[in-house]
Amino acid sequence: MKFTIQIIAVYALWTGATASFSAQNSCTAQSGATRASVIELYTSEGCSSCPPADKWLSSLKTPAGETGVASGAIVQAFHVGYWDYIGWVDRFASPAYTTRQRQQAALGGQSTIYTPQAVLNGRDWRDWHGSGGRLPLGKEPAGASISLRQVGDDQFEATVTPAVGASSTWSAYWTVTEHGHSSKVKSGENAGEFLQHDFVVRQYTPAGDYTAAPKTPQKLVWRSIAATPGHARQINLVVFDPKTGKTLQAVSAAC
């Protein structure tokens, strides 16, 4: 399904805070020497061709009910609402996610957006359905290093350090993704379907644009406001080149 839409302004909320926090409840993540792959799926409960893509995304989870993916990729399902008019409102959708999809498309030279769309490291990835569950994990050196830690119940901080030879300008965003959501669709193209979702983006927060010399660390602070009891979640931080959309590095932690 394809749809052309005007860009919607994104209003980001981010805050820094400090608090005493039990070390035994904290979690951390440290990036590696190679760039992590970032997969974004743009999907909708109102799209009849989206359930197979949602099922494929769920197949990337680790076994035995663990969170994350065995490959180490960062996986995110952005639900969009531009098919809500067909008759079913996607409760996970946000205009900010549509805006992000549109921005990604513009960086890749696309004039339209569609669902389901997979984006790999900032570029349209149409061969996701032919991957056979194998993710194209490259060995490209990381453009930045990231160290993330939890400093409060819903408070996080990270240090981003650009690599030598990488772009001096970078941007970042945080997401909260949750597993194990489901919906019984009562109307629209998927009427009567029972849909199951993993890696659902419940919070998306742009973290700003930065210019820094190589090896110059930048501290980011953030508070999560999204948490659904009973659902395992991931805290993700993605650093990318704002001129191309290309991923520089990313980390994910089950917090």
Regions of interest found by a model, annotated:
Residues 2-10, 14:
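Sec-dependent signal peptide recognition
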Residues 90-117, 121-255:
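Short, conserved sequence motifs used for protein processing/export or organelle targeting and
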Residues 3-4, 38-41, 49, 53-56, ...:
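Aromatic-enriched hydrophobic runs in primary sequence
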Residues 11-14, 21-112:
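Active-site-proximal cofactor/substrate-binding loop regions of enzyme domains
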